[in-house]
Curated annotation (Swiss-Prot):
Keywords: Coiled coil, Disulfide bond, Glycoprotein, Secreted, Signal. Expressed in lung, eye, testis, uterus, ovary, and to a lesser extent in heart, skeletal muscle, mammary gland, skin and prostate. Within the eye, mainly present in photoreceptor layers (at protein level). Residues 423-681 form the Olfactomedin-like domain. This is Olfactomedin-like protein 2A. It comes from Mus musculus. Residues 1-32 form the signal peptide.
Length: 681
């Protein structure tokens, strides 16, 4: 009984709080015709009896009567009454109403007193009136029934939610248990699947390399420029293997030129050397210990061997002519060969290529004069593995004297043409402020043109990771966003160091040391090569690291690749930047056209190559930078030009030189810019 008595009191307290909120929302005086709840009046009526019908009639004072009573002009009818009308044999009725409901004048009088005595209690008095009227007119039992119903509904809802959640949890637990059982059954087969996956991956790589370097079926078997196919690229090669290949070629009976043709070529070369005025230069002493690389065994007759020995004796005279005049901080490109080139696949052509290779300072052309038959031959010298592509057989030659590291002269460098040599004006003198052409894409990216093409197509790689190459017909279409072609590459690229050259897209495959040549006309991987000595960060770059690990470049002499490698001549094993000229056909790297610079990795922002000279910008994320370092591949020397370079939007992720237009293409924080260059004439 005590608990039953306490419960209504608790409910009454909660009810008072609810009424207090209602008061705050509905402030104002309560008139007799107002209702706190829509179905309850302010008059309370009680009835007793079995057959009883009651009716309460309330006649309160009106507002006019209050004003008349206040002014002293009260009438006889100015009063309020509460009448009770009942019907029935045994019926007792009673009607009660609060005085504030019957006599509104009291409220007004009280309000005036409050305004005069305590204006701050005005709101409190209105709240008291509301509570008084609510207590008289409200059926507490009815409200209690409503509250009980709401509480029961809430309990039912909670029970249903608990039941549903428990059922779902049971289903999830059963699913997890079922999956774990399946995982246990497949655990024993995971190792086998991983090994099969690795074998399939290596097999796919070998097939791609074999397809990229396959010999055309239409090539003649007895062609002197045909080469042995070997795309595995390993270091443990048997030397007898190369000897057997060379011997098999010699057994087929290669056509040997007569001695008269050799003498004519020799006479032509001597006349060209005599026609030039040699500059007095000091010849550096060759290194005492130089490692020789055996490219293969070749069998010659006595006449041809004597001609080659004579060509070696004349090589220093040709090397002396390679020094240029000038007072700039770097030497210019070496002189060009003035002798007329003979026809390919002839005896004169073989000897001229030999003379050019023994000269040591010639820059090979980007186009080849040999037949289309090509192969890659991998040799090992110490701990460095290099891949070379030869069109003819050759003999062992010492390293060139122009580089500080022991290297070999070119086996068959292509003689640069007259127009190619004249296109290099000299060393870099100044870089103009950039010119903005468009705002396109993300913060990182690269845009470029094919310097060997006749049209003005623009190629764009948006971001530093992806597999799409977008082509635009010209600059105007690029500004309008009207692309003409979209290339979906079979392997993703990474970085911004890609180039388009001679109708192919050269890029670094993501997270590997592989470089790929993708033919844009036929849409397939034309070549695939591995850079064995590159120091590559194979972790996923979640943000731009400020550089590309493997960077391609194109200048007047051809295609280049720039990458970091360990300096084996330094005891600290620092990582330095390596510069190497590639063969565009098969991406082979030649030891004689590879230079190790003194530039440390991560010590610069961007780099570009002009006329065989590597230039680096010291920063990529500062507004004002400098071309702080330069390396000349012709002399093997470096310098610090300190030329101003402006990063207009302070986030340059690509700088590449276009030898056709002689400008730099740059991608700066989503803006496409070009820089005009000035040279020392």
């Amino acid at each position: 009984m005590e608990a039953a008595a306490v419960l209504p009191r608790y409910l009454q307290l909660r009810l008072l709080l609810v009424l207090l909120l209602l008061v705050l929302l509905r402030a104002g005086p309560v008139w007799p015709d107002s209702k706190v709840f829509s179905d309850l009046d302010q008059v309370r009526m009680t009835s007793e009896g079995s057959d009883c019908r009651c009716k309460c009639i309330m006649r309160p004072l009106s507002k006019d009567a209050c004003s008349r009573v206040r002014s002293g002009r009260a009438r006889v009818e100015d009063f309020y009454t509460v009448e009770t009308v009942s019907s029935g044999a045994d019926c007792r009725c009673s009607c009660t109403a609060p005085p504030s409901s019957l006599n509104p004048c009291e409220n007004e009088w009280k309000m005036e007193k409050l305004k005069k005595q305590a204006p701050e209690l005005l709101k409190l008095q209105s709240m008291v009136d509301l509570l008084e009227g609510a207590l008289y007119s409200m059926d507490l039992m009815k409200v209690h029934a409503y509250i009980q119903k709401v509480a029961s509904q809430m309990n039912t809802l909670e029970e249903s939610i608990k039941a549903n959640l428990s059922l779902e949890n049971k289903v999830v637990k059963d699913s997890v248990h079922h999956l774990s059982e399946q995982l246990k059954s497949y655990e024993n087969q995971s190792a086998i699947m991983m090994s099969i996956k690795k074998e399939l991956s290596s097999l796919g790589l070998q097939l791609l390399q074999r397809d990229a370097a396959a010999v055309p079926a239409t090539a003649p078997a007895s062609s002197p420029d045909s080469k042995a196919q070997d795309t595995a690229g390993g270091q443990g090669r048997d030397l007898n293997k190369y000897g057997s290949i060379q011997k098999s070629f010699s057994d087929k009976g290669l056509a040997k030129p007569p001695k008269e043709k050799l003498l004519k070529v020799e006479k032509l070369r001597k006349e060209s050397i005599k026609g030039r005025i040699p500059q007095p230069t000091a010849r550096p002493r060759a290194l005492a210990q130089q490692q020789a690389v055996i490219r293969g065994f070749t069998y010659y007759k006595a006449g041809r061997q004597e001609a080659r020995q004579e060509a070696r004796q004349e090589a220093p005279k040709a090397a002396a002519d390679s020094t240029l005049k000038g007072t700039s901080w770097l030497e210019k490109l070496p002189p060009k060969i003035e002798a007329k080139l003979p026809e390919p696949n002839s005896a004169k052509h073989d000897d001229v290529r030999l003379q050019a290779s023994e000269g040591g300072n010639l820059t090979p052309d980007i186009t080849t004069t040999t037949t289309s038959t090509s192969s890659s031959t991998t040799t090992t010298t110490g701990t460095t593995s290099t891949t070379s592509t030869t069109s003819t057989t050759s003999t062992t030659t010492p390293s060139p004297i122009t580089t500080p590291w022991p290297t070999e002269p070119p086996l068959h460098p292509e003689v640069p043409s007259q127009g190619r040599e004249d296109s290099c004006e000299g060393t870099l003198r100044a870089v103009d402020p950039p010119v903005k052409h468009h705002s396109y894409g993300r913060h990182e990216g690269a845009w470029m043109k094919d310097p060997a093409a006749l049209d003005d197509r623009i190629y764009v790689t948006n971001y530093y990771y992806g597999n799409s190459l977008v082509e635009f017909r010209n600059l105007e279409n690029f500004k309008q966003g009207r692309w003409s072609n979209m290339y979906k590459l079979p392997y993703n690229w990474i970085g911004t160091g890609h180039v388009v050259y001679q109708g192919a897209f050269y890029y670094n495959r993501a997270f590997t040391k592989n470089i790929i040549k993708y033919d844009l006309r036929q849409r397939f991987v034309a070549s695939w090569a591995l850079l064995p000595d590159v120091v590559y960060e194979d972790t996923t770059p979640w943000k731009w690291r400020g550089h590309s690990d493997i960077d391609f470049a194109v200048d007047e002499s051809g295609l280049w690749v720039i990458y970091p490698a360990v300096d084996e001549h330094d005891e600290t094993q620092h990582e330095v930047i390596v510069l190497s000229r590639l063969d565009p056909a098969d991406l082979s790297v030649h030891r004689e056209t590879t230079w190790k610079t003194r530039l440390r990795r991560n010590s610069y922002g961007n780099c570009f190559l002009v006329c065989g000279i590597l230039y680096t910008v010291d920063t990529y994320n500062q507004h004002e930078g400098q071309v702080a370092y330069a390396f000349d591949t012709h002399t093997g020397t470096d310098a610090h030009p300190q030329l101003p370079f402006l990063n207009e939007y302070s986030y340059t992720t690509q700088v590449d030189y276009n030898p056709k237009e002689r400008v730099l293409y740059a991608w700066d924080n989503g803006h496409q810019l070009t820089y005009t260059l000035h040279f020392v004439v």
